[in-house]
């Protein structure tokens, strides 16, 4: 039995056949229009398929400043005779240096709302493991008018791959209110997102954006106020330059979220005359944790190329669908199939062709198929 290697090792090539059938032509044209709209308009333009994105990193510096004049006789202070739904305490009028602790925190910020101050001494050697400090006197106080203190937020962002770097003063910015609207503040005290000005926000305004009322119920114990127990807030700073087609325009947006079911307190110890005498501060506070995030985009030719190549794949699929419809489902499928698929003569026959006359004869035979 002779093996026909020409049939076994046959090569399939592409043949272009123009089928004059309006049904197939309209279908293929519709596919083509949809693919062009998807690839060019949606993927490349609307979805910015020419852009590669990355998440920026950054740094935060904060500082606290007390107002020129603190409000006295607040409802939560003992010297105020008006009713208050929670426990009243004596009020102290501290400046920013005493209200802020810990100092130098590069990822967060803490402003005290209540402190329990204990005068403690020890009458034995601290080298003795059973030696303990004893509290002589204790005082529980509110820090009055902490809402009027202002916090300055100096932030910087950097995108490593595109090497885009800006300070917050150079950018336009916004803060989300409780309804999720982006607003820009340019008031006498509160300034957010104004180019050339630092971001400054009163703690009371910041709490308002988070939906927090210091004189509302505590997040862990409804019998206390948030002022009494403290709270934790996430302050997200989201950077973006993909909101428009101009990648040189960068904005940032603050969004402030409270952490449910949390209180906050931090201890502070001040040594007095010697290590046997100390002041112990248990501070309850507003704890702000800053998180810098976002999406920074830059032009990338490879991203654009991948977007366009995906369109070529869709064109191939659409052509395959129309071809299968033509050769398998239409009434003229046998005719269309015979036009699309054609088998040449064996290579043995071609070896007999030694001049142009033989090639012309083979060509006419193929045309007659």
Swiss-Prot record:
GO terms for biological process: calcium ion transmembrane transport; cellular hypotonic response; monoatomic ion transport; regulation of calcium-mediated signaling. This is P2X receptor B. The gene is p2xB. PANTHER family: P2X PURINOCEPTOR, P2X RECEPTOR A-RELATED. GO terms for cellular component: contractile vacuolar membrane. It is found in: Contractile vacuole membrane. Residues 47-369 are lumenal. Keywords: Ion channel, Ion transport, Ligand-gated ion channel, Membrane, Receptor, Transmembrane, Transmembrane helix, Transport, Vacuole. It comes from Dictyostelium discoideum (Social amoeba).
């Amino acid at each position: 039995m002779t093996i026909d290697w020409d049939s076994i090792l046959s090569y399939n090539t592409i043949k272009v056949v123009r089928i004059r059938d309006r049904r197939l032509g309209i279908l293929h044209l519709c596919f083509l229009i949809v693919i062009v709209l998807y690839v060019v308009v949606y993927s490349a333009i609307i979805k910015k398929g020419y852009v590669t994105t990355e998440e920026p990193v950054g740094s935060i510096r904060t500082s606290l400043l007390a107002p020129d004049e603190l409000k006295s006789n607040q409802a939560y202070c003992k010297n105020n005779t008006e009713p208050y739904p929670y426990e009243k305490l004596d009020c102290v009028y501290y400046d920013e240096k005493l209200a802020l602790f810990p100092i130098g925190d590069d990822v967060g910020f803490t402003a005290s709302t209540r402190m329990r101050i204990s005068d403690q001494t020890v009458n034995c050697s601290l080298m003795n493991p059973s030696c303990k400090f004893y509290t002589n006197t204790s005082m529980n106080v509110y820090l009055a008018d902490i809402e009027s203190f202002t916090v300055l937020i100096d932030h910087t962002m950097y995108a490593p791959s595109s090497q885009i770097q800006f300070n917050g003063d150079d950018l336009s910015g916004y803060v989300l209110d409780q309804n999720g609207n982006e607003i820009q503040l340019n008031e006498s005290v509160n300034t957010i997102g104004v180019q050339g000005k630092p971001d400054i926000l009163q703690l009371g305004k910041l709490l308002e954006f988070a939906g927090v009322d210091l004189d509302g119920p505590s997040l862990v114990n409804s019998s206390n106020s948030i002022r009494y127990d403290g709270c934790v807030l996430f302050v997200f700073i989201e950077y973006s330059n993909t909101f428009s087609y101009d990648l040189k325009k960068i904005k940032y947006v603050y969004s402030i979220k409270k952490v449910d079911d949390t209180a906050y307190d931090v201890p502070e110890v001040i040594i007095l005359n010697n290590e046997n005498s100390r002041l112990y501060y248990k501070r309850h506070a507003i704890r702000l944790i800053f998180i810098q995030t976002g999406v920074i985009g830059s032009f990338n030719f490879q991203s654009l190329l991948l977007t366009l190549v995906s369109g070529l794949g869709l064109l191939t699929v659409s052509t395959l669908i129309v071809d299968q419809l033509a050769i398998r489902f239409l009434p003229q499928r046998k005719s269309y199939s015979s036009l699309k698929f054609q088998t040449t003569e064996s290579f043995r026959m071609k070896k007999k062709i030694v001049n142009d006359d033989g090639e012309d004869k083979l060509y006419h035979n193929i045309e007659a198929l």
